[in-house]
Regions:
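Gly/Ala-rich beta-loop-alpha elbow adjacent to hydrolase catalytic centers
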Residues: 2, 6
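Active-site signature of alpha/beta-hydrolase-fold catalytic machinery across serine-
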Residues: 8-12, 111
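Active-site nucleophile loop of the alpha/beta-hydrolase fold
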Residues: 9, 21-31
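Active-site nucleophile elbow and catalytic-triad environment of alpha/beta-hydrolase enzymes
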Residues: 68-85
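Short beta-strand/loop motif that positions the catalytic acidic residue
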Residues: 88-89, 95-97, 101
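Conserved alpha/beta-hydrolase "acid-adjacent" motif
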Residues: 102-108
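Catalytic histidine neighborhood in serine/cysteine hydrolases
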Residues: 110, 114-132
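Catalytic active-site module of serine/aspartate enzymes centered on a nucleophile-bearing elbow/loop
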Residues: 127-155
Length: 155
């Protein structure tokens, strides 16, 4: 959800942002049932949470036990709003995407890369990490490439 937030802010406050670094960002929730989550949330209050999508043994991520469906409905609306701003985002962007992400489909990365208005955008595929890549095998590569990107764009 941090990627969607970053893109939303970048579309509205580009003058304050020198660059974006996104790791497995979310910009949409695929599937037909998401369109009805606001109705479903009146009947079913929550659903099982997602998390701990980490390839590296022994590493865990703290997360909620359940996701409130009213919150999921708000997230769906928010992501639609964030997506409308993608063409106006001209900020240089570095995007990391885990090839084997069990939480988000690759369509999130594809949408961002195709709809983002930035002329400077780079996608790096992570081949040895799941969704929570900053805690996984590719973490050091993410940190090093991010450091280089930040140095290049913070003048």
């Amino acid at each position: 959800m941090g990627g969607g937030n970053s893109l939303y802010v970048a579309a509205r406050h580009q003058e304050k942002i020198a660059g974006l670094v996104l790791v497995n960002p979310m910009i949409h929730i695929p599937g037909m049932q998401i369109k009805f989550v606001h109705i479903i949330s009146r009947i079913q209050k929550s659903r099982a949470s997602v998390g701990d999508d980490i390839k590296k043994p022994g590493v865990t991520e703290w997360g909620y036990d359940a996701l409130p469906l009213k919150g999921v409905a708000q997230l769906y609306k928010y992501l639609k709003l964030a997506r409308t701003g993608l063409p106006s985002v001209k900020t240089p962007t570095l995007l990391f995407h885990s090839v084997d992400d069990h939480i988000l489909p690759v369509s999130n990365t594809e949408i961002i890369m195709s709809e983002l208005g930035a002329s400077q955008k780079k996608r790096i595929e992570l081949v040895n990490s799941f969704h929570v890549a900053t805690l996984d095998y590719d973490a050091e590569m993410i940190f090093e490439n991010s450091r280089l990107f930040i140095e290049e764009h913070s003048q």
